Design a protein with these regions (language model features):
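Active-/binding-site microenvironments in catalytic and ligand-binding cores
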Residues: 1-249
């Protein structure tokens, strides 16, 4: 008797094995940038070989630390029924389309507009569609992510997206919008967040999740297979994730 599922599994493994995997999560380590009102990431060597006979670390962090996903409940008090544990674990297993603006030398407060998204699609020949993930690369992570005394500049300053850009992705019926900044569409200037139409109007109210603080976006192809799972956190406002993208060779 043969296992009827073996063939399908072999096909998936062979397909993924022939693709290039890109790790999209920055390392969780002491000193990484954090939203100012969130606790510092703490990693404590709570159990050691010398003292206890084995090794285990204790970790304390906000749900929105490092690469993470925002659920509607994060920003919307009337959507507390949509915490991260109400979404399927495979919700973020889908194709993703890259919108790469890393060559524009964006400054804090600069906005990506719907016209810029359309122009990029014309240039790349790829358009995000229903059920896919839109990935916007500002070039922010590569330029400003650090873990030293200047780490917080990354979260205190950022470009963002205009309201019509946020509506653009909503109208495409995407599953999620992902970026390499701390707050996706929210531009930040000297620690002051500007408008956040994606969080409050265009995305979260429509169950479009928000993925933030991704790295290595410059390694992506125009379309890739995106895979990430949130932790199964009871009533979670969001969750850290370990996202990867599989790109054609």
């Amino acid at each position: 008797m043969t296992d009827s599922g073996t063939g399908a599994i072999d096909v998936v493994l062979k397909t993924l094995g022939n693709m290039r995997m890109v790790d999209l999560a920055p390392k969780l380590e002491r000193g990484i940038p954090r939203w100012p009102t969130h606790p510092h990431l703490t990693i404590d060597k709570a159990v050691t070989h010398e003292h206890d006979g084995y090794y285990c670390q204790a970790i304390m962090m906000a749900e929105h630390t490092g690469a993470h996903v925002d659920a509607p409940a994060h920003m919307l008090p009337d959507r507390m029924d949509r915490t991260i544990d109400t979404f399927r674990p495979d919700h973020l297993f889908t194709s993703a389309v890259l919108y790469d603006f890393s060559d524009r030398d964006l400054k804090p407060g600069d906005l990506i507009t719907a016209d810029m998204l359309r122009a990029y699609e014309e240039k790349s020949g790829v358009k995000v569609g229903e059920g896919e993930i839109a990935i916007v690369n500002y070039g922010w992570m590569k330029r400003y992510w650090r873990t030293d005394s200047k780490a917080q500049w990354y979260v205190l300053n950022a470009p963002g997206m205009s309201e019509d850009a946020c509506d653009f992705f909503r109208e495409r019926k995407v599953k999620a919008v992902a970026t390499d900044t701390v707050a996706a569409e929210t531009a930040i200037i000297d620690g002051v967040p500007q408008a956040n139409p994606g969080h409050m109007k265009s995305w979260l109210p429509h169950d479009i999740l928000i993925i933030e603080m991704l790295t290595n976006l410059e390694q992506l192809t125009p379309r890739s297979l995106f895979m990430a799972m949130p932790l199964h956190i009871d009533e979670g406002s969001g969750s850290p994730i370990r996202p990867v993208a599989f790109c054609p060779n």
